[in-house]
Amino acid sequence: MALLTRRGLAALPALMLPAAAGAQATWPERPVRIIVAFPGGSTPDLAARAVQGHLAQALGQPVVVDNRPGGGGHLGTEAIARATDGHTFGVTIGGPGSTGKILNPALGYDPVTDLMPVSLLARLPFVLVVHPSVPARTAAEFVAHAKANPGRISYASTGPGTLSHLAMEDMAAREGFEAVHVPYRAVGQAVLDLVAGRIQAFFAASGGVLPQIREGQVRALAVTSSERFPAIPDVPTMRESGVNADPVVAWIGLFAPAGTPAERIARVAAEAGRALAEPEQRRALETAGFVVVGSAPEVLRAQVASDVERWGGIIRRLGLRPEG
């Protein structure tokens, strides 16, 4: 066997560089999977499918959307975190993607350490909606009605510790009223019960309730964003309605499992941004109630950190734990 000289050993790293670069350049070598932690037709699913086609063209491989609903998004989000094939990304929301471990210390993953932010795809303002029988046409009137009827107003959420729950609890604490929390497993069922009058109020993500607002089945009192929402421009903000409330905005993020190479994340983030910049995709999502973003990884990382600080504090203060 020939012995390598000192000079030959020194040259080895340089000789290996082209091979390493070539291996990185060939990624992806097979189809890419996007796990969506919610069912088909949900807002996270719509966001994933909005980038799916462009990503497939840009990456030169099929991109498959794999819906993994259940557990309020935690089951699918854990599947994203646990993927080890190097070809898996995932779409989830705040809660499963940020404060999940604070709400449930027994959760099988930690969003902060087991997920790598790729792109903040979109934001969705919340809308305070009520059944038409509620004698309130502004958020301030709703607060006054709730104060005059302590414990007699029921409101929906999509589960303990979700934004729809925390937004109402935060407003109730600030304004000094009590209401009965009725958690649901799905937005659709909560909206059906609101339309039927079985509950009186709901902080709903805009994309899940726009048709009912437009058809007059529910009354929109205020949006929770800092500015009016273009999809329903006649609905004022909470502050315009006379209620002291910080903005509450849902978000949809694209993540990768921890350990995914930074170059891969940067590439997918850039292509996701290009996909969402396409006019046709943008218009379709805006019509569905989205505020389209398509950010760099740093923006999503900051959003997760903000959620942990703000909403994590409320979860701890209220002593919230998941159902069951």
Where are these regions (language model features)?
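Short loop/turn segments at beta->alpha junctions
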Residues: T5, G72, T138, P183-V187, ...
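Hinge/capping helix and adjacent helix->loop/strand transition within the periplasmic-binding protein
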Residues: R82-H87, I102-Q189, M238, W251-A284
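Paired acidic/hydrophobic, glycine-rich loop segments that form the ligand-binding mouth/hinge
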Residues: H87-T92, Q200-A204, A220-A222, G312
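C-terminal lobe and pocket-closing loops
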Residues: R123, V209-A277, S306-E309, E323
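N-terminal export signals
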Residues: R7-A23
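Beta->alpha turn/N-cap motifs
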Residues: V91-P96, S157, V187, A204-V209, ...
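N-terminal (or domain-start) structured segment
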Residues: A23-T113, R152, P160, F177-Q200, ...
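An extracytoplasmic/periplasmic, membrane-proximal ligand-sensing/linker region
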Residues: E29-P31, A173-F177, R214, R239-E240, ...
